[in-house]
Amino acid sequence: MDTLAGVFAVNTDVTDLSGLRTIKPDYKHRILIGAQRTNGHGVGKISELGAEIANEDVDKIIDAIRTAEGFYETDAFLLCAGAAGGTGSGSIGVLTKHLKERYIGKPVYDVVVLPFRQEETTETRTIYNTATCLKSTYLVADAVFLIDNQRYVKKDAPAENNLNSINARVVEPFYNVLCAGEETNRRYVGSKTLDAGDIIQTLTGWTVIGGGSSTLERRLPFCGPKRDFREKMSDTSRSVHAMDQAISELSMPIDPADVGRALYLLTAPAKEMSMDILKQLGDNLRNLAPNALIRSGDYPRDSRQIDVTVVMSEIGSVRKITDYFTKAIDLISVMKAKKGLGYQTRRLEESFDEIPVLL
């Protein structure tokens, strides 16, 4: 099912745009910005320059986006960027701000991909860019999906395989959530549909997403319906296992007790779903996130597995984000000290304003 009105890539680097595989190669879909200032060679991790260029070329970007078929019928915008680089981290907040100003009432969600551990330890600019990107997007986006690259790394795998695997694992949980409310085939319409309205009412502030699955046993067509109590128990345990996996594989480590809103979607063959299973999943999520307003839905599909997608939003505190801000404040203080402006130790709340906003 095609749930996307259009997919576009924006960059200041010609080489990065040329390396894409699935986005159309024309200039309306691969959008080069800042060519006169960078000669198509990127901004060299200087996120302030990325923000300036995005502000200058924002009309070019939006004009290209508007060419998408069905643009005005879309429910929301979804912007993705790496937090550690220059173009993405600098421009995502700028573009989010302009989209919200032009298309009032249409939510804009940002996906911010956090750097690998080795990037944080070897490149000083990484921490600074990440902190400014997180602060800027949080101030303007309706919700910010946090993706921690380090959670998905396989240490002994080749770099290209690692990146492809990470991209796939990041994207997979979104698919069923986006499809469930757009389904037109009545065979695949759930008894409790999770549609765009449910998603919009759930997403706000810091947000994480995860997916889990459990393989179903193959049954012969002439075996008839399941009647044994052990089979019923097995169905429930598979669904619970899939939810446990989804929560353990959330895109960022969080404390579910700090979550204000959440949703879960059960995707499986219609005959494998029941109200008992949905209730059990809801009870499990409620136990983990007692303070959350929970929404749920089911999505019947022809498949040999049970999939559960979990989204947790309105997260009160994320330790890793706080760490980025703390390190960035220390870095800014050191930079000022080197310029002869002095160094003074202050609380995080008092120093937070020193992190620039790239809008």
Residue ranges and their predicted role:
Residues 1-359:
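Tubulin/FtsZ superfamily GTPase core signature
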